[in-house]
């Protein structure tokens, strides 16, 4: 059994060398940035960001108003219990503002990932189709290439032709 395993391992490199490797690379990010779906996604993200910024500004204005009222109240030598109550309101509002800021950033990130996923899947499917149609052994993302030989084929233009309208 051990001899059979060693024989298979010994001849494996020869069988791999006998196959012609057809290599290609693609700049999928460049194509994604030019797709109409990506531009639609960016508009949705910008609209959502604008909405969140509007809400955030309202909260900040409310905080500034409460702070100003508190400062005015301090000048009148108001009862200590009232001052403590207002100070607590301001602290709670500051916490709400910080939570809103954090949550809105997370929601924005989540929405962007949600909208980008089908675009990336479409690009991946199209790259697979091109690879099968043209008989490529491997297709690499251009970002990971340290070296490319003259025999490697750039499929970016083909991918653009199929996806960018």
Give the residues covered by each predicted segment.
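Amphipathic, charged alpha-helical segments and their helix-to-coil junctions
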Residues: 19-165
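Sec-dependent N-terminal signal peptides
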Residues: 4-14
């Amino acid at each position: 059994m051990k001899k059979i395993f060693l024989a298979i391992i010994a001849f494996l490199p020869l069988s791999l060398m006998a196959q012609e490797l057809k290599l290609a690379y693609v700049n999928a990010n460049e194509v994604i940035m030019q797709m109409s779906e990506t531009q639609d996604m960016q508009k949705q993200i910008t609209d959502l960001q604008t909405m969140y910024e509007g809400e955030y500004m309202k909260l900040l204005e409310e905080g500034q108003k409460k702070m100003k009222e508190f400062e005015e109240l301090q000048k009148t030598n108001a009862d200590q219990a009232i001052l403590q109550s207002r100070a607590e309101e301001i602290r709670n509002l500051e916490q709400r503002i910080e939570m809103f800021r954090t949550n809105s950033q997370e929601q924005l990130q989540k929405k962007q990932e949600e909208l980008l996923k089908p675009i990336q899947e479409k690009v991946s499917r199209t790259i697979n189709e091109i690879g099968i149609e043209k008989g490529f052994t491997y297709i690499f993302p251009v970002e990971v290439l340290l070296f490319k030989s003259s025999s490697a084929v750039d499929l970016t233009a083909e991918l653009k032709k199929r996806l960018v309208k």
